[in-house]
Curated annotation (Swiss-Prot):
Interacts with RAB7A. Interacts with EGFR and FLT3. Interacts with BST2. Interacts with STX17. Interacts with YWHAE. This is E3 ubiquitin-protein ligase RNF115. It comes from Mus musculus. Residues 100-139, 274-305 are annotated as: Disordered. Signal peptide: none annotated. It is an enzyme of class 2 (transferase).
Amino acid sequence: MAEASAAGADAGSAVAAHRFFCHFCKGEVNPKLPEYICPRCDSGFIEEVTDDSSFLGGGGSRTDNSTATHFAELWDHLDHTMFLQDFRPFLSSNPLDQDNRANERGHQTHTDFWGPSRPPRLPMTRRYRSRGSTRPDRSPAIEGIIQQIFAGFFANSAIPGSPHPFSWSGMLHSNPGDYAWGQTGLDAIVTQLLGQLENTGPPPADKEKITSLPTVTVTQEQVNTGLECPVCKEDYTVEEKVRQLPCNHFFHSSCIVPWLELHDTCPVCRKSLNGEDSTRQTQSSEASASNRFSNDSQLHDRWTF
């Protein structure tokens, strides 16, 4: 018992010989032992004040511009977001931090130094625990924390079927890599779709079949019925020379030949020069392209941006 009292007295005298600054209270405090936490807000985000510290002597503006203060504000903001709940077990791996979570839940039932409007306290961050050292552990840089949080967003789970630790907490309905993020991702999807559907139409007609199409003369009876070219929509005149397809549709030669050089089909009835219906062939080609696109999506877990 006497040894414990002596140890406590030695620890108290060691703390009294040093000055500590709480980044949440933004003031000088005398930390609680042996956890080294702030007596006002129960936060472990405290730091020993040394001769080169600017926490107390530099005024409020220098404190607000310090990296540690910016990190505290960032952490305070992320603490109240929905997805940070999943990150806490991975950002706080120290057993002492896990033990203090139960104590913090108990402290949240009453108001503290900041009054009833103060939001819930933050999880314990890296603390000053070493009695022999003269400098506390420095908090990690803001960039490192952000990289640690967002590094796993687009990574696949190491175990198939198991949720990734850096998940979106159910906000997304599938892997984030399956989504189109930004204009670049959308352009990649459209480009792949166009590439799959590029050659799904009927193939070009044979040149021999195109040249063998008969050239006929428009009669007065056809003109009286209002016969026109289905491509350019111009009315035919009597004795005008036009090309006749096997489906008995008439076209200007300058209108139908360029089309047949690209597609072996009638622009009106979609029948080929052989008299076969090309609609079924087109549907079969589109279904095949859709299956290829689906297979490609399954092979690639996420888009490459």
